A protein has these predicted regions:
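Sec-dependent signal peptide recognition
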Residues: 1-7
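Residue-level hotspots at or immediately adjacent to binding/recognition sites across diverse folds
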Residues: 4, 19, 50
Length: 100
């Protein structure tokens, strides 16, 4: 009985420590990508070009593509008008660290 309890606790603690919803990415990875995407916008790329670039990336977890697509939408949307390359990364890092 104790063995099953310990296995259950191990499974729960492993699940809590899992990287979801970021996949294998860290908040710094998210911030770095946001800055990269903002640099694309500043260089004159369109949202469609940025989304096409996402298709060429390799992902360790399906949720990573979903997250990066959401960042592209933010960067190329109304919020991105007021961001710099640096501030885009800072905003996304802060949002990630606070769980948003």
């Amino acid at each position: 009985m104790l063995r099953f309890l310990l296995l259950g606790l191990l499974a729960i603690s492993t699940g809590v420590q899992a990287a979801y919803p970021l996949g294998t990415m860290t908040c710094d990875d998210i911030a770095s990508f946001a800055s990269e995407a903002m640099s694309w916008r500043k260089e004159g790329q369109t949202r469609e070009q940025a989304l096409a670039a996402l298709e060429n990336r390799t992902y360790n977890d399906p949720v990573e593509k979903k997250n990066l697509t959401a960042i592209v939408d933010l960067v190329f949307g109304p919020y991105g008008r007021n961001w710099t390359v640096e501030s885009a990364g800072n905003v996304m890092r802060t949002d990630c660290m606070t769980g948003r």
